[in-house]
Amino acid sequence: MPNFCNPIAFRLLSATNPYIMKKLLFVFAICLSITTQAQKAAKPAVAALPFDTSITAELKFRNIGPWRGGRSTAVVGDLQNDQLFYFGSTGGGVWKTNDGGSNWKNISDGYFGGSVGSIAVSKSDPSIIYAGMGENTMRGNVSEGFGMWKSENGGRSWKNVGLNDTRHIMRIVIHPKDENVIYVAALGHLFGPNAERGVFRSKNGGQSWEKILYVNDQVGACDLVIDPTDPNILLATFWNVKRTPFSLESGGPGSGIYKTIDGGNNWTNITKNKGLPQDTLGIIGITISASNPEIYYAIIESKTGGIFKSIDAGKTWTKTSDDSNQRQRAWYFSKIFCDPKNENVVYVLNVEFWKSTDGAKTFKSISTPHGDHHDLWIDPNNPQRMIIGDDGGAQTSFDGGYNWSTYHNQPTAQIYRVSTDNAVPYRIYGAQQDNTSLRIRHRSRGGQIDDNDWEPTAGFESGFIVASPINSEIVYGGNYSGFIGCINHKTGDARNITVWPNDPLGQGEGTQAYRYQWTFPLLFSPHKPRR
């Protein structure tokens, strides 16, 4: 087809067929107009105005809280100073206290990321600390990490010592008499296979590593303990686990318990030993009694799982309890510990903090400042001294868990979303994982912002929070499972405005009209603020 906007084609057509001359003139006029407009549009854009960076050079970030802790899955204490403890946060790095938990200070900022899976202090030289990166609670919103880090001066400085592709380091064990010998239990990639997983050992303080126990590229190590009386004996547990953005597959071939009696040179799979579950196994937590090293305890995820005890160093086992209180959400918990002075005192971490005094047959809940417990360290010389890690951070106790330090002194909160309103002064909104939603004015009359300036608002731990553009006292907030709430801060009225009003917790997906992600967006139209 001829190009009617081409002058040569125009002349040829008009010469051979004068009848269409007038129509071609009209078409040519339109084409000329379009071409002219295109040429105008093709002019070079106006250069962007330069931004004077000196305007913002003096601006600095400041911490406005909240000061209550976020989730901690790694805790440890110093054996030479009973006031010295450390914890690793899933979003705030490594923290240290020199006064028994009254005050905490971050000691890892500027070195590595915030997600810590394990932390260990050398018994022979407590100035040496190892931190393993990558959260060890395998949530859908889990944060991975970047290998092993070492401090040789009590946390004043750090250096990376490898294992960077392990992603999730579950446990670090340091030889009690030789700080250069370190063992690491690494889970590996959670969302896919990889080779850098299993149990690793270093004999030169982290300068090099050898993989001493490996199952396959889909099974990783999830717990590791050393015999307090014989450092050549270690127990390791392995877990076949995989996450997708919408599911968790826990359990499968390769999950089990392994034992070495020569410091990790050779391992024996003891999973088939008498008394242990023989169906599909998931996550396994394990511990060795320091007062009687022939006694092992294990908490095992399986259809016939529960808490198991061995009195002959793992040769045979007996189920002592299948109480669901200690087994719920096994993939999130499954940690077990034995009192170093009493073989019959056993602690199990779950939503509540459970204690047994009869060899894990029965348990009693011990009150703690927060719920969802993930790690515990007990002083081997003084079992009354301990530190626990939970969804509220870390707390210390000097009386065996009857009294605990506060967690309102460690700003490690994981905040999902941040928004502001149109008030004067404007307020800042956010939802804190494992806690509540919050709002605060960006400045206070007292010259500083502290915990007293925060207040709860609509929604809960995982949602978007938005204030009405018309009335900032009316706030809307979301939460997991599709919950949406509204609160009027002026009147105190609150209501549920969830799209589908049925409570979805505990129901199958087939009963749900809609499905929601853990956190889903809420927003107002910038054009029609009532929408």
List where the protein language model places each region.
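Bacterial Sec-dependent N-terminal signal peptides
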Residues: 1-42
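Beta-propeller blade termini and top-face loops
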Residues: 39-531
